[in-house]
């Protein structure tokens, strides 16, 4: 069967470029990473010393619980992004079911998004180890992630990825209906244990879903933080997250409107013929 022509969205992402401070992603490191992230991280209570736990107030215990939730959910997010890459994106290219250009439009900047989340996860992991699993200060880590040049870069990458989400889902659905080999590949990939019974249509939206969680988690950490300077800096990082989320939402709306108009134009053209 002849492969259908690729109908891309009206706007294409810019070239990937590089993060202001991060190294270029090393793709060969990602596959072992998927194995590394297969098991959930150990809860902080099981790793902290009994003496350290006994000294914590009720409010500080709650703070540590939310920090642990941020860490554990970032771990889970890196894992699912790696599944998207290693179970779907790379094999689709290897099997020549999608070209590199098509993949760059369906999964724009996926490699760099994984690297950014992985670096954030590693910075949280280092805090846990340095503080014997009872984290004293998290404000610098989260401000470095969501504020300043790194925050701007994160916003740029996530805007590209999330704004193509609706179009990507539609393109994949269309390909599955028209191309038997493509459909068989997707079904086989979705059956792999790494997907944990999720379909590709469930995995693609995870970046947008993750962006909605950061402000809530950071506000909850700030609410349970006694030190006023630390509290203020965490609230600043939460505000940075809200700005990123609002910007991404606007980009998503713009692209969805373009996608709808493009679809209507194609339908009207086909009807006239």
Segments (PLM) and residue ranges:
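An all-alpha helical bundle fold corresponding to the catalytic cores
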Residues: 1-272
């Amino acid at each position: 069967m002849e492969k259908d022509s690729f109908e891309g969205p009206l706007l294409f992402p810019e070239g990937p470029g590089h993060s202001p401070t991060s190294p270029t992603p090393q793709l060969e490191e990602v596959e072992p990473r998927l194995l590394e992230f297969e098991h959930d991280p150990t809860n902080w209570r099981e790793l902290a010393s009994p003496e350290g736990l006994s000294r914590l107030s009720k409010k500080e215990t709650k703070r540590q619980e939310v920090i642990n939730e941020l860490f554990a959910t970032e771990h889970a997010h890196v894992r699912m992004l790696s599944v998207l890459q290693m179970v779907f994106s790379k094999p689709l290219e290897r099997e020549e079911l999608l070209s590199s250009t098509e993949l760059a439009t369906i999964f724009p900047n996926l490699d760099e998004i994984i690297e950014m989340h992985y670096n954030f996860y590693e910075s949280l992991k280092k805090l846990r180890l340095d503080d014997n699993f009872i984290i004293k200060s998290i404000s610098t880590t989260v401000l470095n992630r969501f504020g300043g040049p790194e925050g701007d870069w994160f916003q740029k990458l996530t805007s590209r990825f999330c704004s193509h989400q609706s179009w990507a889902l539609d393109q994949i659905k269309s390909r599955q209906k028209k191309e038997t080999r493509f459909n068989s590949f997707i079904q086989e990939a979705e059956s792999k244990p790494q997907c944990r019974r999720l379909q590709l249509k469930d995995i693609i939206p995870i970046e947008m879903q993750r962006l909605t969680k950061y402000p809530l988690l950071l506000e909850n950490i700030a609410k349970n933080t006694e030190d006023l300077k630390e509290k203020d800096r965490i609230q600043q990082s939460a505000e940075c997250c809200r700005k990123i989320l609002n910007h991404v939402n606007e980009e998503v709306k713009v692209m969805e409107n373009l996608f709808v108009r493009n679809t209507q134009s194609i339908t009207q053209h086909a009807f006239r013929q």
